[in-house]
Amino acid sequence: AAYHSLDIEWGNHDILWMGAFFGNAALICNLLRINCLYRNLQVIETYGINLRPLMSFALEEYADDDCENFVISDLYGIESELERNAVLRKMTKAVTVLQLKLENELIRNHPEFGMDDHILLRDDTLTEKEKWLVNHLIGEFSTNDRLRKHVNFLLKKGSMYKVFNG
């Protein structure tokens, strides 16, 4: 389909998706954290992205933690069963911890950002399991053909602030 008079102004979520497709692990974790937090995993599943390794990791890593500080939003007024919420809380915690560790690495690698005060974890070295999981997630996002088509469309028809129809 041709879209001759279409342009898109990118928002934060568009940029998250683009960064995730291009393999930025911190953005992948941020995107997953938001989608877990708001019970919106069907969007991820629509792309065919395999989240089973994340779920397995979260259930194993936080088996004895109810993750009560990771409250799942009932954005759509659908009160799902408590067991599913418990799994989502664990997944949310897992991707949050991964996101913070990965962001710390970015901050340390770029002191010119002046963001040292944003380093929130002292122990931020990825474990072997976390490294495997991050690499799996990067592969799921960066090799996804459907996501590639959507990102290419956003890149071709969009920009950060220049919008012109004509």
Residue ranges and their predicted role:
Residues 1-166:
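Feature recognizes metal-dependent phosphohydrolase scaffolds
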